[in-house]
Amino acid sequence: MSEHVYNLLKNHHSVRKFKKEPISEAHIKQLVEAGQNASTSSYLQAYSIIGINDPEIKEELKEVSGQPYVVENGYLFVFVMDYYRHSIINEESKHDMQTSFESAEGLLVGTIDATLVAQNIAATAEDMGYGMVYLGSLRNDVERVREILELPKHTFPLFGMALGIPEDDENGSPKPRLPFEHVFHANKYDSDKDSQRETLKAYDQTVSDYYSSRTNGERTESWSNQVANFMSAKQRLDMLEQLNKSGFIKK
């Protein structure tokens, strides 16, 4: 096993402070090509990548996201579920393909395809010495993002990725993940609630200790509390409507 690859993946953490130095076109091409070689369901390649270095477009997307690093980075990617090219094939084909890419299964396939591509790009970027952070916040206003990026029907902006050279004072670190035993199930799912609660209790303490050590005791939030606060907030409740408008979840 390559210790380099293992350690690279284990040491991943989100970077939100970047130097102003742009990423070269040669590196962007390498990143995209590495992404393209991710696995793709049934060879559909149901994704596109929008690369953004235009400051005005970044500013417009920042208004949607609310995050400064949408502008302050070396480069910005937006990952798009894309069946537009498939719809063009459908227009010229004797087969009726539309049900497939307008179905819930089509949504899952396109989302998974785009995510695998993005993770290949993320790992490659980190191997090049760049830092990165995902931007789910672009879904705060899907309609506006579609307008800014001029996305046609049968496409959907899933998330973004800001990347670049980390600032010298960037001091992020990997957050503790759930224990191996809690996420890995041998042969069958272990749904024993007592066991799950016991593991979560220990993990909550680990996360609380992590935050405390990072903030000199100012933050001691547990993982369970963080999850409860986030998932009880009513956010992006228009997502099904936006998917329908884009031509998805019709079946």
Curated annotation (Swiss-Prot):
It comes from the Bacteria. Keywords: Flavoprotein, FMN, NADP, Oxidoreductase. CDD domains: NfsA-like. GO terms for molecular function: oxidoreductase activity. Its EC number is 1.6.-.-. Its cofactor is FMN. Coiled coil: none annotated. InterPro entries: Flavin_OxRdtase_Frp, Nitroreductase, Nitroreductase-like. Pfam families: Nitroreductase (PF00881). It is an enzyme of class 1 (oxidoreductase). Belongs to the flavin oxidoreductase frp family. PANTHER family: NADPH-DEPENDENT OXIDOREDUCTASE, OXYGEN-INSENSITIVE NADPH NITROREDUCTASE. Reduces FMN, organic nitro compounds and disulfide DTNB. Involved in maintenance of the cellular redox state and the disulfide stress response. This is NADPH-dependent oxidoreductase. It comes from Staphylococcus saprophyticus subsp. saprophyticus (strain ATCC 15305 / DSM 20229 / NCIMB 8711 / NCTC 7292 / S-41). The gene is nfrA.
